[in-house]
């Protein structure tokens, strides 16, 4: 249920940002706001504390963000405080990023490897994925030594697991079945 609400909030904010031609600005501001909220224990505790009034929480946010972010974005934060959803701002940001990718005909491909891919490998992988999905691909690389070797690629719900670890796990299962 909450994912649906997160999506609705994110879509509403995205449409405002799109109307104002400030989508990138809103996304960047939301990322920074999340860093401030989740990176500052004192602020986080104020927001989280049930005995601190909504009025005081809103005042705190106005003091921090007024004049630094767009008024519509600040209003959005005020609504989240009123609805007691401000602690779930990260989820709204994630949904807004998904909407942004969808609207730009782009998919996020998460790639795990033991060593960073070379520019040539990235280019070839992106080309292959763009051909397969007929969409632009945004590649996010992660180094994961536990996979031993090969690549692990996730695009949406699709997984391409060409890791040495998965092959070894498969061989182990086959050998255990034979016993």
UniProtKB/Swiss-Prot annotation:
PANTHER family: ATP SYNTHASE DELTA CHAIN (PTHR11910)
Organism listed in the record: Clostridium perfringens (strain SM101 / Type A)
Family: Belongs to the ATPase delta chain family.
Topology within the bilayer: Peripheral membrane protein
Lineage top rank: taxon: Bacteria
UniProt KW Transferase keyword: no
Main localization of the protein described in the UniProt heading: membrane
Coiled-coil zones: none
Function according to Swiss-Prot or TrEMBL: F(1)F(0) ATP synthase produces ATP from ADP in the presence of a proton or sodium gradient. F-type ATPases consist of two structural domains, F(1) containing the extramembraneous catalytic core and F(0) containing the membrane proton channel, linked together by a central stalk and a peripheral stalk. During catalysis, ATP synthesis in the catalytic domain of F(1) is coupled via a rotary mechanism of the central stalk subunits to proton translocation. This protein is part of the stalk that links CF(0) to CF(1). It either transmits conformational changes from CF(0) to CF(1) or is implicated in proton conduction.
Matches recorded under InterPro entries: ATP_synth_OSCP/delta_N_sf, ATPase_OSCP/d_CS, ATPase_OSCP/dsu
Cellular localization per UniProt: Cell membrane
GO MF, any single term: proton-transporting ATP synthase activity, rotational mechanism
Oligomer and partners: F-type ATPases have 2 components, F(1) - the catalytic core - and F(0) - the membrane proton channel. F(1) has five subunits: alpha(3), beta(3), gamma(1), delta(1), epsilon(1). F(0) has three main subunits: a(1), b(2) and c(10-14). The alpha and beta chains form an alternating ring which encloses part of the gamma chain. F(1) is attached to F(0) by a central stalk formed by the gamma and epsilon chains, while a peripheral stalk is formed by the delta and b chains.
Lineage: Bacteria, Bacillati, Bacillota, Clostridia, Eubacteriales
Name of the featured protein: ATP synthase subunit delta
Keywords of this entry: ATP synthesis, Cell membrane, CF(1), Hydrogen ion transport, Ion transport, Membrane, Transport
Keyword Cell membrane included in the entry's annotation: yes
Gene Ontology CC terms: plasma membrane; proton-transporting ATP synthase complex
